[in-house]
Curated annotation (Swiss-Prot):
GO MF, any single term: ribosome binding
GO cellular component, one term: cytoplasm
Catalytic activity line of the entry: [protein]-peptidylproline (omega=180) = [protein]-peptidylproline (omega=0)
Role description: Involved in protein export. Acts as a chaperone by maintaining the newly synthesized protein in an open conformation. Functions as a peptidyl-prolyl cis-trans isomerase.
Keywords for the protein's UniProt record, in alphabetical order: Cell cycle, Cell division, Chaperone, Cytoplasm, Isomerase, Rotamase
Family: Belongs to the FKBP-type PPIase family. Tig subfamily.
HAMAP family: Trigger_factor_Tig (MF_00303)
Name of the encoding gene: tig
Organism: Aeromonas hydrophila subsp. hydrophila (strain ATCC 7966 / DSM 30187 / BCRC 13018 / CCUG 14551 / JCM 1027 / KCTC 2358 / NCIMB 9240 / NCTC 8049)
Top-level taxonomy: Bacteria, Pseudomonadati, Pseudomonadota, Gammaproteobacteria, Aeromonadales
Domain notes: Consists of 3 domains; the N-terminus binds the ribosome, the middle domain has PPIase activity, while the C-terminus has intrinsic chaperone activity on its own.
Protein's name according to its UniProt entry: Trigger factor
Length: 436
């Protein structure tokens, strides 16, 4: 076998592989003999038909099979001998097999880029430092109370935090528009559900009031026909309600699985959950900054094939996230939607992979156990979850990969420029939610 390697453009390589005629002819004869023994030929016993007839009947089939086998086996040998790492399946272009002649084919494919991660010491990370304060705990308890609140009708002017029930008809230049009309519409004032100015116009109004709301749709509004348009909403307020928060009674506490009904036990459980959520958010913040710095310090070419594979994976995840689709009912989500995210994933994967290989990072079992225990605390029976992971090798390997990634992040962090900044619990959690 002879091999020549050509760089066509960027990461694309073209191998021209030549297989000696003797090797090809022997493979064709073997294939023809096999076909002669298994195929029925009128007038001849199995395996007794003349070679000329066998070639005439099965020659094309034999050549196709041999060409396929030769391309697959010799391509693998060629990339091993030339130390090439394909980033995707090759495009094969074979010449026709001719008896007594060498068989030549080309294989075109992309390779992974060759690079060494550098610039770790230039990465800047602002490490947020936060704790769950009593005020944060109190706010969370209030949130739980609001989630179980009831509403009571009042004879009062609408104010922030109150719920109103109203009818309205929207128009632009005197003409009603689709989606601009509602009856019995419920709205909690201050929730920010409506376009700017809508809720403000309701403040101070009482049940029975009829009024007009003048607003302008934002320039980036989702409906193309409404962007930047001035509109009027002829409105009537039907009902004003105030929120009634439940007291921290034994009955209320039991709703959250605290069988004793003890308020302090509820607070302890909520604090534990908040601390777990905070720890994850702090970790995510640092990790995101490390990866951003790693990418900025190492600009590398990306194989188009690897990016395309990642786009397909992201597209499938999106379809599953939105409920899944059967057969041909799935919408065609354009690649452009996922291009940036896919490129980042591939780039981060390549860079982190190099850090892991270069530093020979292996999963630390203590770290693996710590990750499992942390995940288990979110379940009712942590012990059962831990045992499940320990008995499931596939799940365990997934956690080991997470541990290796965490260890790589820690290594980069040890070389980076790190400063600490005290921040509030809400700030960390809100940033984490926005990034998700």
């Amino acid at each position: 076998m002879q091999v020549s390697v050509e760089t066509t453009q960027g990461l694309e390589r073209r191998l021209t592989i030549t297989v000696p005629a003797a090797t090809v002819d022997a493979a064709v004869r073997k294939e023809l003999n096999g076909l002669a023994k298994t195929r029925r030929i009128d007038g001849f016993r199995p395996g007794k038909a003349p070679v000329a007839i066998i070639k005439k009947m099965f020659g094309a089939m034999a050549h196709a099979r041999v060409a396929d086998e030769m391309m697959q086996s010799n391509f693998i040998k060629a990339i091993i001998e030339n130390k090439l790492s394909p980033a995707g399946a090759p495009t094969m272009d074979p010449k026709e097999i001719q008896e007594g002649q060498d068989f030549e084919f080309t294989a075109t494919f992309e390779v992974y880029p060759e690079f060494e991660v550098a610039g770790l010491e230039t990465i800047k990370v602002e490490k947020p430092v936060a704790t769950v304060k009593d005020e944060d705990l109190g706010n969370m308890i209030d949130t739980l109370r609001k989630q179980h609140a009831t509403w009571s009708e009042v004879d009062a002017a609408a104010a922030d935090g109150m719920r109103v029930t109203m009818d309205f008809v929207g128009s632009i230049d005197g003409e009603e528009f689709d989606g601009g009309k509602a009856e019995g519409f419920n709205l909690v004032l201050g929730a920010g559900r409506m376009i700017p100015g809508f809720e403000d116009a309701i403040m101070g109004k009482k049940a029975g009031d009829e009024f007009t709301i003048d607003v302008t749709f934002p320039a980036d509004y989702h409906a193309e026909n409404l962007k930047g348009k001035a509109a009027k909403f002829a409105s009537k307020l039907n009902k004003v309600e105030e929120q009634i928060l439940p007291e921290l009674t034994e009955e209320f506490v039991k709703r959250f699985g605290i069988e004793s009904g003890n308020v302090e036990e509820l607070k302890a459980e909520v604090r534990k959950n908040m601390e777990r959520e905070l720890a994850q958010a702090l970790k995510n913040s640092v990790k995101e900054q490390v990866l951003n710095g790693l990418v900025e310090a190492n600009q590398i070419d990306l194989p188009k094939a690897a990016v395309a594979q990642e786009i397909d994976a992201l597209r499938q995840q999106a379809l599953q996230r939105f409920g899944g689709f059967q057969g041909g009912n799935a919408p065609e989500l354009p690649a452009e939607l996922f291009q940036g995210q896919a490129e980042r994933r591939v780039r981060v994967g390549l860079l982190l992979g190099d850090v892991i290989r270069t530093n020979e990072i292996k999963a630390d079992e203590a770290r693996v156990n710590s990750i499992i225990e942390s995940m288990a605390t979110a379940y009712e029976d942590p012990k059962e979850v831990i045992e499940y992971y320990q008995k499931n090798e596939q799940m365990l390997n997934g956690v080991r990969n997470l541990a290796v990634e965490d260890q790589a992040i820690d290594l980069i962090l040890s070389k980076a420029q790190v400063t600490e900044k005290e921040v509030a619990f809400d700030e960390v959690i809100n940033k984490s939610g926005a990034a998700a």
